[in-house]
Amino acid sequence: MNTIEKPTEKAEILLEALPYIRRFYNRTVVIKYGGHAMVDDELKQSFAKDVLMMKYIGINPVVVHGGGPQIGSFLKKLGKDSKFIQGMRVTDEETMNIVEMVLVGKVNKEIVGLINHAGGKAVGLSGKDGSLIRAEKYYLSAEKAKDTPPEIIDIGLVGKVKEINADLITSLVRDGFIPVIAPTGAGDSGETYNINADIVAGAIAAALKAEKLILLTDVAGVLNKQGELINTMNNMEALEMIHEGVIEGGMFPKVKCCMKSLREGVRKAHIVDGRLKHAILLEMFTDKGIGTELVL
């Protein structure tokens, strides 16, 4: 009995995935890879296999990675504190040098190696390579008293995306490569900017008119006041939760970049739990999916 049921169950799982494989064939999916999924060995292997499977069945994955824990660990070893405002890392010149060294020189190469070892053709890029990401300085704003202008906060060499060289990514994808992108960018005067990886992923997804933007994080998705998972959330609901302070910290730029990417042509955006093995496949190829789906 069991010997018959088990193969049958596997067949049913494959059949459940079939309409999604058909729907996403030859479409681009941008994945922001970050959090616990980057430091747990089992999850790293799971991620590489998910990306490889997508490529094998005709989907075009583009990976944008973070590296916050690795940067924080390196800064700590050097006796330098990490400071965050509204989920953004305050970045002076010394910190920027460390950020670039860790993101581009270490983390990016490790991810490329993981995917290639699994059988893929990954190529690593920073935003400075081939003028992939043109950036400009980013300032935060904080609301003050009613009827007074917001406070402008300078957080150093933190940038925002000015322009994406989509042709470079498209060319690599067309040649069978899986682009793996570190979130740094170059300013007009040649200065290097640290850019939030979620924001970079959203901008790249918009530039490519991607089918999906998937952000991997260390929580189940977007949570309500009671700490319960929100399965689907629209733009108005997101704005209300931001105003009420329910969406804050590191989740704030994630939700913000998802909504911006949707307005700029991305079909769907998802914030999912990267602590789950095969989180990407569960989101893309099952009826229920996981995490929070964001819509306009």
From Swiss-Prot:
Keyword tRNA-binding belongs to the record: no
Catalytic activity: N-acetyl-L-glutamate + ATP = N-acetyl-L-glutamyl 5-phosphate + ADP
UniProt keyword annotation of ATP-binding present: yes
Main location: cytoplasm
GO biological process, one term: L-arginine biosynthetic process
Binding site for substrate: 67-68, 89, 194
Enzyme class: transferase
UniProt EC number: 2.7.2.8
Family stated for the protein in its record: Belongs to the acetylglutamate kinase family. ArgB subfamily.
Name of this chain's protein: Acetylglutamate kinase
Gene: argB
